[in-house]
């Protein structure tokens, strides 16, 4: 290279190196600062490197600076931390330039009450779009995958929190921005779903270290599948709703003809099957009954008439409450070892014992639908409870009395 050219080239190369070093230095500083923000907010319990790999984690990260959105175990459990990013803010056009995109949460059991589904709950997409029922995480882990994140549970032998012994702990990793550009086909991206599972598991194990728990969770499975779409015809019921297809209940025009189902997993603290009347069946039943019923609510939204069935297991089964729709009545307990119905709402419960642990099974009917359902609904509840208890090898099954059906306020 001629000497007259060599000098300018060297200068350009040096300038390029300086620019590259400056860019690298700035990116390194931003990464270090982002990690610090996550550690400060989440008490060092949530893996910062995994949060930083989530799709909306670009740009500048900050955290909610308040007692409600930061974790300090000295303040007791449960707690959560909330992380913001400018990338999420730019994508959604927020005035502040940033947006809350991630929540890490944790807690222990025993905890507060579990409340059965409300007869006025909205359990399917009210606009007629697909609903994605939660699914078991799998991989030998007690956990669920939701439409926004992952929740895991870990037994906590020998652990202690707030000066009291605990039986288990839980951790949740959740994405707060689940619309484009941070989604695929209306769901979390495959990448984010896997990262959230890793984050939840690591958070649970870190909390186990702090609390002195003996056990640890294994690594979560890779390539966690997207959630299935529902509801589906009752003729295709599988998993938690397979018993409904096998019993051919949908042949009756008074019973639901669609289901929201999940894969079965006997480890789960809450396993669910939802039976739904499709628009045509709900309208037909309403038209056939409206002249015979006072104040019958017309089902105008998809899935407004439903039967929701849950099984609560272990520690959560010890503190289940039957919902109180109108809020002016104290919710009634659904105690293990018993069975019955709410005196206020169309909610029933049964109980059993599985592997030495209590189980509480609940059934909620949508308001309006409870006015037209025949007493044969007891056969549906019995079939559901039988399926769960036989699958799990349960004993001491207690079911509501026949006189508890159909629902009539006491």
Feature-to-residue mapping (PLM):
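A short, solvent-exposed beta-edge/loop patch
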Residues: 134-213, 316-410
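Generic structural motif
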Residues: 86-88, 109-111, 157-161, 174-180, ...
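Alpha-helix initiation/capping motif
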Residues: 2, 47, 77, 116, ...
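Long acidic/polar interaction regions in large eukaryotic complex-forming proteins
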Residues: 110-138
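Short, low-complexity intrinsically disordered segments
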Residues: 27, 98, 168, 303, ...
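Extracytoplasmic low-complexity, Pro/Thr/Ser/Ala/Gly-rich segments
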Residues: 25-117, 215-280, 284-293, 389-410
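Hydrophobic membrane-insertion alpha-helices, especially the h-region
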Residues: 2-27
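Flexible, solvent-exposed loop/hinge segments that line or gate ligand/substrate-binding clefts
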Residues: 261-349
